[in-house]
Amino acid sequence: MSKLMLKNALVNGAIQDILLEDGIISKMGPELAADTATVLLEQEGNLVIPGFVDCHAHIDKSHLNDKGENKYVHGTGGEKGALTRIAKAKFTVEDISLRAERVIRDAIKAGTLILRTNCDVDAIVGLKGIEALLGLKEKYREQITLQIAAFAQEGIFQDGKTPELLEEALRMGADLLGGHTITCGEGEKHIDFILELADKYACDADFHLDESGNREHYLLPYLAGKLKEMNMEGRVNAIHMCTLSALSEDELKKAIELILESRLRVTIAPTAISTRKIAPVKALLKAGVPLGLGSDNIRDFFNPLGSGDVKQMALLLSYLQAFYSEEENAAIWSMITDGGAKLLGANYEICPGASANLTAFSAKTPQEIISMQLQPSTIIRSGRILNI
């Protein structure tokens, strides 16, 4: 494999050269020497990172609106869910693969290195989505890390088949479980089942938790207590948590204490603003809650827009909750880079011995990249320059 050297890259806060050999970062430092066999890539002091991290998506249901019969309509979450179920009944492995692959390729082009997606598992679609996404995970394994959560979108106990399907999804190779506590009207029982199965298979769990924004759906106290009871603190990522925005100041303080005690990680999906308030991100950051950002739905019945470029979510959240100062810009940047990677338990570093995964920009600051929605100037994965 030929050697690559990025010259004068802004990385880890300093201008350095980065030598890549055999898919690994072999050396870093100022003014490294290069032999004639080394391909030089001048960066002119521009920013280089490993890549972006998208902590939550639904790529198995992406691009449904691209099909003529699937038109977006304004309506309630229940109505959109019903339309999705009609579409899911027609899913094939090939269909899911084609639509999901489009998101994966677009995400890679945008600089995404790590993507966690939920994948519906139920009596309607069976394990078709899991089969399709596992194939894509292998196909693109040198370009992007794909984490797959077997997701109980339609609930667990309504059809008598979903419990076994979720377990089979884990046996097939799904990385973790996904719970949807609002769906079946049995939120506590839903949490119990997902945690018990996750414990059995020693995997983590994602929960769409308190996503309605309504106080009657507030399940954080129950989940936190269950995690403590089962000694599973630190193994759950909570998505949305919109109900936090409906709490009083004192209630929010107590909620954050529960989040910290249970070592809960939280992923914000800013597009939820279309139907309810999103969680108070600044309060969570101030308390030290691990946070990530996710694209969530992409061009389907729940969201007719999006592309799988998580920078869009960073810009949207910046506007929605006034992340404007230098310190606040840095917090948003961390949610789609190192902080997001930590939330997902993924490797994320540029240092000698690390995998040669680098994403370069014609920009010197994160603020410029987010503001201008800049695409990478160069993408390197496993030591190879990508042309995708």
Where are these regions (language model features)?
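Histidine-rich, glycine-flanked metal-binding segment
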Residues: 1-5, 10-49
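Di-metal (Zn2+ and/or Mg2+/Mn2+) metal-binding site signature of metallo-dependent hydrolases
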Residues: 46-68
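Active-site gating loops and adjacent loop-to-helix segments of metal-dependent hydrolytic enzymes
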Residues: 63-96, 201, 219-237, 255, ...
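Histidine/acidic residue-rich metal-binding segments in metalloenzymes
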Residues: 128-142, 159-237, 243-265, 275-293, ...
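C-terminal cap of metal-dependent C-N hydrolases
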Residues: 352-388
